[in-house]
Amino acid sequence: MERNSKLINKKFIQYLIPSILTIFAMQFTSLLDAILIGNLIGSTALSASAMCVPIIYIVQMPGLALGIGGSIVVGSLLGKRDVDKANKAFSACIIYGIGVSIIFAILAPIISRPISEMFAEDLREDIYQYVFITLLTDPIIVFALLMSSFMSVDNNPRLATIYFIISDILKISSMFLFIKVFNWGMYGASFSTGFGFLVGAIVIFWYGFSKKRMLKFTFKIKNTFIDLKESLRASGSMAINYLLTAVQMSIINVVISNLVTNIVDLSIYGLICNMVFVFDLISGGIVGVIPTLCGIFNGEKDIYSLKSVTKKIYFMNLISAIIITILVFSLPNVYSILFGFEFVEYQENANMLIRIYVFSFIPYELNRFTTNYYPSINKNAPSYLTVFLRELFFVLPLTLALLYGAGIKGYAVAQVLTELLTVICTYIFIFIIEIKNKQKKSLFMIDDIIYLSYDFSVDNNILNASKVSLEISNFCIKNNIDNRSAQMIGLSAEEMISNIITYGYKNKKQNFIDVNLKKIDNTLILRIRDDGMPFDPTKYEIDNDEKYTTSGIKLVESITNKMQYMRILNLNNTILEINIGGK
């Protein structure tokens, strides 16, 4: 018997689609946001909103970084079946994330005006309005970002998608109302984001009553920082990335707003800066499943699933990046028209700069994969290297040098060089580490299994139950495990799989069950994973009145030393342990 990826592929698609829809909704809304600002308020306002991006990175960092890092840790803990620690990590992220965002909100009246004064005079009032409301509504937005990440990892990816779609619809419709009808200008443009997330939060109440939910908020404030440590470690590269990005973008924006006095060039700069929303329309959603899937599979030490999913994410991300690059390169006119670019006589110049800048997209997405993936498998070095190379060593020197030498064109070229050089250096570093550690020189740095393990999959044919028992028993005996332990674990597997096939599937379609047996020290650990109806065998009680019983479960309980159950990724995970030799 061999392992296949059919069960995991099905689950991958079930998580990938909501992730793509979520990020698509976010990025598409950001695109519409910029389009509405450019068309309803003007090109100067669009440039001002581009200047505000670094501030948005900083104030939303608690939600963005802790959301990703926290979901990696929570997913890993759920994979290790430690629900109590997962609840503590989840609660700590919410408490500290909201706490930091409240500080930003309190500082809004104090720091908004000084921030706007750093920029060119024509942009100051628009920047002040946008920054003030962004800071004021930050607690709402951070809460939304955190909850969407945790809902995804906690068996509810569709709810996270619904939350963003509802919030984004409310944002765009209210933005039009606030700008066009109420004439609130940039106040309205910024306030619409917080308004959308606030009203859309009704979805979080649905999550609270979800039967699939495993995470629970704990109100124990004591020792929350200890519970936060792992999440901070996992989100460290993300946080540094957002912080350094904000710092270098702030420096570049201040230089550009004072160096480039031509309103046409400033408008083109606004066009280029907003291209990141186009970049992430599809690719962002593909990378977005990394914390959930890779974090959980790494926690479970399910190497087969981790390798399978990682390769799919990497190559899908690369292919989508290539497709979007070709589309934008071919249709720069469409892009600039959408954003309300008013200077028709300078269209060719705008097209040239768009075409240069779009070549940064493929290496940009490869770098995004690096910063998201490696923390999920507890290999932070490549992620940190990517962040420091891109945000410190390359982007500022190259951008400032080329800006002074070639203006906005120099800025576009600098971004391409920055992303490309970062990818090359990071990949060289990864392969050096793999060679040094005598690994197989894999880009994904997945460690080999160091214990006895056997993976295979079976379809939901009742005849397979007895075959599984024989397969497992033979494997154990071949690997010098005593006959009694081999028979006990084989019998347990047969009973559990028979129960899954008989009662877990209502339809007669072919479904697959993944089986993993591993020997750690003197313990045999059997994990059975299926996508049948939710059923917790540890809570099963025989009912004398029911027509059919699964009394074999009680037999399994009596012959195993430990039985655990968890519903992870909307999959039943039953774990049985037997001490070898009855020890």
Q: What does each of the following model-derived ranges do?
A:
Residues 46-104, 144-159, 268-327, 366-383:
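Small-residue-rich hydrophobic transmembrane alpha-helices
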Residues 1-16, 74-137, 181-235, 294-359, ...:
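Short alpha-helical transmembrane segments in multi-pass integral membrane proteins
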Residues 473-494:
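Conserved short strand/loop->alpha-helix "switch" segment adjacent to the catalytic nucleotide/phosphoryl-transfer site
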Residues 526-550:
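Glycine-rich/acidic phosphate-handling loop/turn and adjacent ATP-lid/helix
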Residues 14-33, 133, 167, 196-200, ...:
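Transmembrane helical elements of multi-pass membrane transporters/channels
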Residues 28-47, 116-121, 177-184, 243-274, ...:
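Helix-terminus/linker motif at the lipid-water interface of multi-pass membrane proteins
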Residues 441-456, 558-583:
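Flexible, glycine-/charge-rich segments associated with ATP-binding catalytic modules
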Residues 67, 71, 133-153, 160-168, ...:
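Short runs within selected transmembrane alpha-helices of multi-pass transporters and secretion channels
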